[in-house]
Amino acid sequence: MLEKLQNSRNALGLIFMLPAAVLLLLFLTYPLGLGVWLGFTDAKVGRPGEWIGFENYAYLITDSVTQLALFNTLFYTTIASALKFFLGLWLALLLNKNLRFKTFFRAVILLPYIVPTALSAIAFWWLFDSQFSIISWVLVKMGVIDTYIDFLGSPWNARFSVIAANVWRGVPFVAITLLAGLQTISPSYYEASAIDGATPWQQFRHVTLPLLTPIIAVVMTFSVLFTFTDFQLIYVITRGGPLNATHLMATLSFQRAISGGALGEGAAISIAMVPFLLAAIMFSYFGLQRRAWQQGGADK
């Protein structure tokens, strides 16, 4: 029996995967299933609750705060993901060149990503403070402004402030991953295109971008997922304020379920995020399949 398992790669692989699969079932599947169940109940903290069907979801559709949180989440995800992509791609192209000390710069660029989220959020909270902001202090000393900017006191200032914090933290992940993709592109493609008279822009458009598209699809999928479900940055910097202007679906779910004690309502908000996350995953999947088909791969 043991010899058969050793000779069967599939069976041996399944055995090695079993411990991880059990852990995933315990720590991922069970909480997800419990969350789905709670979303259909009126459970409160300390009280199991009863089955109420879709009442929580019907209430959320008409709830103005939930509607605002959905808008904030989509706006936050769209702007932050786009900025992270363009800045990350620019940094990746820059670091892919033969620069002096490029190894050092590649290491430095990872610092925002490896710093604990709560620590970086506290730093940004200090940077955006209405009284002690170093940004406002510098601008006042330079004569650009007369009074300190209230970064977190008005809705739109707060929205763009937390977007800036998310971009600062997320750009390294995009840049390093795209840089790894650029390293896989053979220099012979660029040499051949240069012989044909291609300009740097034409090389980027017709060589770099098509070959990098699968990596871009994967990176942006993870970027969108991480941004859409962001919690720590928002909770530490603004806690959803001012006037719920920076509440995301994740922070609102926490506020309703933990702070407010409405476990069923909070769970319903969390489950309502799932269709948007699935849409992002499916968009990436079909994008990869389309690119594989265009490049002559198997159309699955």
Protein language model features and the residues they cover:
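Short, Lys/Arg-rich, polar N-terminal cytosolic tail immediately upstream
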Residues: 1-8
